[in-house]
Each structure stands twice: as C-alpha cells, then as structure tokens.
Amino acid sequence: FKNIKNFKFSDKFADSNEMLNLLINFYKYGFVVIQDVPTNNNFLVKFGNMIGSVKRTNFGEYFNVKSKPNPNDLAYTALSLSPHTDNPYRNPFPPCIQILHCIENDVKGGHSTLVDGFTVTEDLKKLNQDYYNILTSTKVRFKFSDKDTILESWAELIHLDEKGNFQNVRFSPRLDYVPQMKREKLEIYYNARKCLSDLYNSDEYRIEFRLMPGDLMMMDNHRLLHGRTSFDPNEGNRFLQGCYLDFDSTEGKLLHLRRKFNL
C-alpha cells in the first residue's frame, strides 16, 4: 500500500501508456491516486468517461462531498467516517469503482483512509474460522431511505463465489439489519461482526493520507473500505466530488490499451 505509485494527469492521458499503467496498478492494488487533475466543476465525470462509463445513481451522475445542513448521509458532515463500502444496499451489486476528486481542502483533519478488505478477510479466516464461516454465509438486509428513495438488498458482509473465493465486502454498520436467528448463532454473529469491525479499524490495516486539490483517487469499492478523519468546517473548506463506474467498462479499456501497446 505505502509504495503505490502516484500518476500525473495530462491532456493526452486517455489513451496513453500512463493510463495503461494506472489500470494495471488499480487492478493489482485496488486503488490509485492521480495528481494534477483539473479542479473544474464535475471534471471527474469527464475523467470517468475516459476510462469507462460513469454510472448514474439516485445521487445523480456525480455527487458533492461537503458539510451541509440536514444531510441524508454522514458523508455530507464534518464527522469522522469509519471504514465502509459505499452503496451496499444496491441489488445485485454495489458500484464496483468509486472516484473521489479533491477540489478544495484547507481544513485541519479530513484525511482519507483506506483498508484492504481482501487482506482483512484472509487474516480473519486464519484468526477464527467460525467467525469467517458465519460472516460469509449469513445474509443481512442493507437499506437506504430518504424522502425520495428506498433501496434494499440482502447479502453477506463477505461474499464468496461458488468456489469459495473472495468476491466483495459490504460493510456499512449504519445501514445493515441483522435477521432473526437462534440466540446461540446470533451471539456468534455479533461477536464475529465486532471482530471484523475491530480489524477494519485497526492501525495495522489502515493507511491515512491527505488528498490535495487536483488529486483524484480511484478505488475498488468491492475490495477497499474507505473513510476519513473528522475536521472543523469553520476552519476552511473541504470539497470533494465523487462518481461511480462498473468494472466491465474499465476492463474493456484495459484490454484496448494492452492491444494498442502490444502487451
């Protein structure tokens, strides 16, 4: 994590060898940071469409991340955000890729945090097989609701494919509802969930860094959990814009660039 290369944006970035290296690193590590991206309003949509197709949601084609009154999500406050994945309530899957573009950031605090859910899952399996088994087999209800929208989905906190391989994590404690189950199983489940949360919040797995204006972070929302430290909105401005993409379009871009550069 700590040796991830930062990339530099340029006018010829879209079909460049730099873009190819960016996508290779993204699929290897789960996130990349691109510097010197123009801070024009909603430029991240243009960037997103360079590498795939921006996915429209109930939040729009893109969304603003800044403190505001009466928010429908904690992201729109100055509070700290513990590690989580976005949109776990979408069916069948949450958006695969999230882009966050820093427009302004002159506050104290407000650092970005990332946790590799795949690494945590592997370590949880070694630490306690029973916890791993119950978290990969118990579906919980995820729900989002505001005055305009209700979204629900049932899924495991850790989803495996039919061969038992890691597929994705869905973790957002404010949005999940545990189903009814026998008391003994429920106790194991809550202990397992707490253990998982403790791992996600451990300094051993978390990296913390500051996004500066012009920095754009692209992360795998199926693998990476993200968060932020708290900040004081009275000290300055912290303004990011975000959007989502799906894997098929970025994988197509990667294949196109591999063919172009004979790799």
Question: Language-model segments: which ranges?
Answer:
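Active-site environment of non-heme Fe oxygenases that use a 2-His-1-carboxylate facial triad
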Residues: 1-31, 36-37, 41-263
